[in-house]
Amino acid sequence: MSIQSSCVRLDEGRWNPKNREVLEKLIEKYRDTNSYAVFDWDNTSIQGDTQLNLFIYQIENLVYKLNPQKFNEVIRKNVPTNNFKERYKNLDGEVLNAAKLANDIHKDYIFLYENYIFDKKLSLKEIRNTEEFKDFRAKMHYFHNALPGNFRSELACLWEFYLLIGMTKNEVKSLAKESNDVKLGEAIGNVIVESSRVLTGEAGIVRGIYDNGLRIRPEMANLYHELKRYGIDVYIISASMQELIEVFATDKSYGYNLDTENIYAMKLKSTTDNILLDEYNYDIPFTQREGKSETINRFIRPKYDGRGPILVAGDAVGDESMLTEFKDTEVLLIMKREGKLDNLVNDKRTLIQYRNLKTGLLDPK
């Protein structure tokens, strides 16, 4: 039976049966009509956050190409020095600020740079057992969590990206592949780390928390394959970095097999040698919140006679604009997370797809 005459059939997988049926009918309706669908990546196309997990991987393995002076500049860049909100305290109940954390992190980094990053005087196992590493790890995670809770989201994103400067784009892609492969094999869930009780520094003792681990979502990969199979183009718009999403979305080892030219994500400026700089490339929108809709309007809609996407999928407030912006959008696929996008649950276009928090797999309920 030819594709033209066959019925659309998504793999059953762990889809909610109603969601699967609606998606199949949508593909059937718009097959070969020069239509397109747009998806978020982190916690939508996959379980977990690929940018966050690279941040975690960098810390765990001390993969930086920054000398202490440049590292010190980067972690302070554009970050206000006023005290954080009341809830951001150390274990002694003292409210913290960026300057105190950065001072401690910088001191730790000097030791780590001299003994491992620049000169392998110690093994990775040995350096991880030092008080400096314990302090660095916890305070980096604490700082990372405090930024979006106290300042604009754009600043928090760029702070994370800038830790990759000094690397070429290909080096970042290689690092992303390493990180993905390791994190796909680790347990998912929150990890709590405590800073050194010996090297308390200016910030004192803090606890950092992070959401570790990644999982592939075969149901989403299959959905992308079927959309493409029936002539519906698939686009990714992500608030992670372009190089990271390209690796995960296009490398055949992960099974999504998407097209590089259909990926729109965050980009830093770079030198003529493709070395990343600590400056955002505003030639494209900041692909978060309204920037996702702007990306569709500027770069995607013109290819389709000004029509919006027939299907948009996301999981959080950063996706809300592109989920609600376009009158042509017939289905909103929400990969539901607790407390996220509750305002769209009752939209008649919405499909709610739950996940199992322990396994990261889709939940068919």
Please place each PLM-identified region on the residue numbering.
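Low-complexity, serine/threonine/proline-enriched polar segments
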Residues: 74-170
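C-terminal cap/substrate-recognition subdomain and adjoining C-terminal extension
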Residues: 3-22, 27-36, 131, 150-151, ...
